[in-house]
């Protein structure tokens, strides 16, 4: 049902009662999911322009200049609510939707990333959600031939009733091949192509704009779309061929609000209106009414703007791929959105009012009762080795091999660096590669939304830096609870400010994304952790070898870059020892941009064998991860005057470990930023000492701990 306040505004504008179908249009297009009515004022604070930005926010995907005439299409979406109600189909159709956003811009999809957030795997329900969501992503992505090359998986009890499925997609085309969702000319036809239209996904946009009820799995299942990846693959090839032949003037994927949303937004973006004949839509089920035809979110569908003289050729092309195609309307000079069904006009609305008239507001923002519990930090553990192994065996740090082995991450033969390292790398040309990273730090963001949001950018930028890449663009997915609660809106507001400031300091534009609110569970009486997840892309030159994330050469000097601080709030170490709300979140250092630039220069010099970002689990987790094939001797005595657990497990931002056989040259590159030689790659064990501790771990002990998640899932 439409909120009463919205209904009053609509009645005043129309001068009458809206029809049932019109109410459905407003319910979906004015939903939080479609209109960003709560977050729009905040999103405007992002810097979205840059020298490489061709198309920024507002289209199905952003377009970023890459190299040698190539451009990248990039977008990020969530499919959170559907993935709780029906995890396999919810996750699968999340992949399908973002891929269609990419092809609607004229680009071929070449990569996916999947930041995922789950409750702990200690209940049958959470285990079911985890397994089915991974299967859904693998089942859809593998079938359409798009590799999942990077991702993040994070576990916390506050995601138990509301897992998060975020997806980043990247596509590639020539700049002259770009198509937009901006309508071109009145009189052009609207062709609906792809799968037939059923009742699945009906009301999906409005469903995604409210909290999950205890009965959501039964009541909301019809709102979850059902995907067919084999049809999607045909849609990809058909759409790109139609664009190559010059038949498509503008194009939009059918996602939230179905045909109604796509056709109205496409027309409005070009300053035109549209007339839709609902009867003309190819229907999967008998006796569908106008409401269902217009607003169902059946998957694998596109709407094309086609010149009248090209309609027959387009329909023939659609038929060649054994897909459904029909002329369902046309563009009009009059900026109205009208829908006809069985000879009766059931929708007649000013199109700008429908697509852009949702009232936006900056909600009340109040800081919550402080989350930090002073004095609750865990004591220094008596057995540091046991603590070390406990932290690196945490599922948030441990290898995600069980997940990414289910993905075909080498399809299309572009993958240079496979999943499991700091960033994915794809070959675009013989000389240039695309570097990708994604993720978030939810626990830190809960305690300090500003610094948490800022550090999301810094950490992901460092993931690119250790491969020698600087950032080209950022997309985001802002996952939060109910914004009507002042403390939740405060989290959202400050996370956005931190994320925006971090991106500006690194001169990386924020070019698009998604807002997913109302992520709360009636069943568990919880809101998710504030989760401003991002995807970031960069460019790397293949003229010098890319550093590995793992120690590669015995005898290499190990260099710590950046400053290690005592603040441990939001860290994985604190979480492992039941101190979730203790401590202060480390601030991003003012010289973070300079540190990242220095790491990029070092990686590009060709003098690094290995390089690894430090984040969750700190130096301990970083060393353990790098010791995959070789041991190391490390001395932290001179790093700083910190306790043993602070030295080992601090997650202070803007830090990295580098390994090189030419330390003098690398130290010269790092001379203007904090750095220190802390050890050497050697032996078959990891030996770490400080002023008052020594730890020795065999490579087998490290491997067993680091493979904890894979061993648990394979048991």
Curated annotation (Swiss-Prot):
Record's subcellular location: Cytoplasm
EC number(s) on file: 6.3.5.3
GO CC annotation terms, alphabetical: cytoplasm
Binding annotation for Mg(2+) 1: 77, 514
Active-site residues, as the UniProt record annotates them: 33, 79
Pathway where this protein functions: Purine metabolism; IMP biosynthesis via de novo pathway; 5-amino-1-(5-phospho-D-ribosyl)imidazole from N(2)-formyl-N(1)-(5-phospho-D-ribosyl)glycinamide: step 1/2
InterPro entries recorded: PRibForGlyAmidine_synth_PurL, PurL_linker, PurM-like_C_dom, PurM-like_C_sf, PurM-like_N, PurM-like_N_sf
Catalysed reaction, written as an equation: N(2)-formyl-N(1)-(5-phospho-beta-D-ribosyl)glycinamide + L-glutamine + ATP + H2O = 2-formamido-N(1)-(5-O-phospho-beta-D-ribosyl)acetamidine + L-glutamate + ADP + phosphate + H(+)
Gene3D superfamilies xrefs: PurM-like C-terminal domain, PurM-like, N-terminal domain
Binding-site residues for Mg(2+) 2, renumbered to this chain: 101, 253
Pfam families reported in the protein's UniProt record: AIRS, AIRS_C, FGAR-AT_linker
One of the record's GO molecular function terms: phosphoribosylformylglycinamidine synthase activity
Annotated keywords: ATP-binding, Cytoplasm, Ligase, Magnesium, Metal-binding, Nucleotide-binding, Purine biosynthesis
Source organism, top-level taxon: Archaea
Tagged with keyword Cytoplasm: yes
Annotated positions binding substrate: 78-81, 100, 225, 297-299, 516
Primary residence: cytoplasm
GO biological process, one term: 'de novo' IMP biosynthetic process
Subunit organization: Monomer. Part of the FGAM synthase complex composed of 1 PurL, 1 PurQ and 2 PurS subunits.
Function: Part of the phosphoribosylformylglycinamidine synthase complex involved in the purines biosynthetic pathway. Catalyzes the ATP-dependent conversion of formylglycinamide ribonucleotide (FGAR) and glutamine to yield formylglycinamidine ribonucleotide (FGAM) and glutamate. The FGAM synthase complex is composed of three subunits. PurQ produces an ammonia molecule by converting glutamine to glutamate. PurL transfers the ammonia molecule to FGAR to form FGAM in an ATP-dependent manner.
HAMAP family registered for this protein in UniProt: PurL_2
PANTHER family linked to this entry: PHOSPHORIBOSYLFORMYLGLYCINAMIDINE SYNTHASE SUBUNIT PURL
Family recorded in the similarity comment: Belongs to the FGAMS family.
Name this protein carries in UniProt: Phosphoribosylformylglycinamidine synthase subunit PurL
């Amino acid at each position: 049902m439409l909120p009463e306040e919205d209904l009053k505004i609509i009645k005043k504008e129309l001068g009458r009662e809206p029809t049932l179908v019109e109410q459905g249009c407003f319910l979906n297009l004015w939903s939080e999911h479609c209109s960003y009515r709560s977050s729009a004022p905040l999103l405007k604070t992002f810097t979205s322009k840059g020298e490489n930005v061709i198309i920024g926010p507002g289209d199905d995907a952003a377009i970023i200049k890459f190299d040698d005439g190539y451009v990248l299409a990039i977008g990020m979406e969530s499919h959170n609510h559907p993935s709780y109600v029906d995890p396999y189909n919810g996750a699968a159709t999340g992949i399908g939707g973002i891929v269609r956003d990419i092809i609607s811009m004229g680009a071929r999809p070449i990569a996916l990333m999947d930041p995922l957030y789950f409750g702990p795997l200690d209940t049958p329900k959470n285990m079911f959600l985890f397994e089915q969501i991974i299967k859904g992503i693998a089942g859809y992505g593998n079938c359409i031939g798009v590799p999942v090359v990077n991702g993040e998986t994070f576990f916390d009890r506050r995601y138990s009733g509301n897992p998060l499925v975020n997806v980043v997609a990247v596509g590639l085309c020539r700049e002259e091949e770009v198509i937009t969702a901006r309508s071109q000319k009145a009189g052009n036809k609207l062709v609906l192509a792809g799968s037939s239209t059923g009742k699945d996904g009906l009301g999906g946009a409005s469903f995604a704009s409210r909290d999950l009820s205890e009965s959501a799995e039964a009541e909301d299942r019809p709102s979850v779309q059902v995907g067919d990846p084999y049809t999607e693959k045909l849609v990809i090839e058909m759409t790109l061929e139609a664009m190559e032949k010059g038949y498509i003037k503008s194009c939009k994927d059918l996602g939230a609000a179905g045909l109604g949303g796509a056709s109205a937004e496409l027309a409005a973006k070009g300053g035109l209106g549209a007339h839709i004949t609902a009867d003309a839509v190819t229907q999967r089920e008998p006796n569908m009414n106008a409401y269902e035809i217009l607003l169902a979110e059946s998957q694998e569908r596109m709407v094309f703007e086609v010149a009248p003289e090209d309609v027959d050729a387009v329909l023939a092309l659609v038929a060649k791929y054994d897909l459904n195609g029909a002329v369902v309307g046309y563009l009009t000079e009059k900026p109205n959105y009208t829908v006809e069904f069985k000879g009766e006009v059931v929708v007649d609305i000013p199109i700008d009012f429908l697509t852009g008239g949702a009232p936006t507001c900056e909600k009340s923002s109040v800081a919550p009762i402080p989350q930090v519990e002073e004095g609750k930090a865990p004591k220094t553990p008596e057995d540091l080795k046991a603590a070390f192994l406990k932290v690196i065996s945490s599922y948030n740090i441990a290898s995600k091999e069980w997940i990414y082995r289910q993905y075909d991450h080498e399809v299309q033969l572009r993958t240079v660096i496979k999943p499991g390292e700091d960033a994915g790398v794809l070959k675009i040309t013989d000389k240039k590669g695309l570097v990708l990273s994604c993720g978030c730090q939810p626990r830190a963001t809960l305690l300090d939304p500003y610094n948490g949001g800022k550090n999301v950018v810094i950490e992901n930028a460092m993931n690119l830096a250790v491969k020698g890449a600087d950032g080209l663009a950022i997309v985001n997915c802002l996952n939060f609870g109910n914004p009507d609660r002042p403390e939740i809106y405060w989290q959202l507001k400050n996370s956005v400010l931190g994320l925006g400031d971090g991106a500006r300091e690194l001169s990386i534009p924020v070019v698009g994304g998604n807002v997913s609110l109302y992520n709360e569970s009636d069943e568990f009486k919880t809101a998710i952790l504030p989760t401003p997840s991002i995807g970031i892309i960069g460019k790397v030159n293949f003229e010098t070898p890319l550093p590995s994330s793992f120690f590669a050469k015995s005898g290499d000097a190990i260099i710590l870059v950046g400053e290690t601080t005592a603040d441990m709030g939001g860290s994985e170490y604190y979480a492992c020892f039941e101190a979730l709300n203790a401590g202060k979140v480390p601030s991003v250092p003012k010289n973070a941009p300079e540190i990242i630039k220095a790491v990029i220069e070092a990686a590009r010099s060709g003098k690094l064998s290995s390089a690894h970002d430090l984040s969750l689990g700190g130096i301990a987790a970083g060393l353990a991860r790098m010791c995959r094939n070789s041991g190391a001797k490390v001395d932290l005595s001179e790093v700083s005057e910190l306790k043993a657990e602070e030295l080992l497990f601090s997650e202070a931002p803007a830090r990295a470990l580098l390994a090189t056989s030419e330390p003098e040259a690398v130290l010269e590159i790092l001379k203007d930023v904090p750095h220190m030689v802390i050890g050497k790659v050697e032996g078959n064990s990891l030996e770490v000492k400080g002023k008052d501790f020594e730890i020795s771990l065999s490579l087998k002990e490290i491997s067993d701990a680091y493979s904890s998640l894979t061993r648990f899932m394979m048991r």
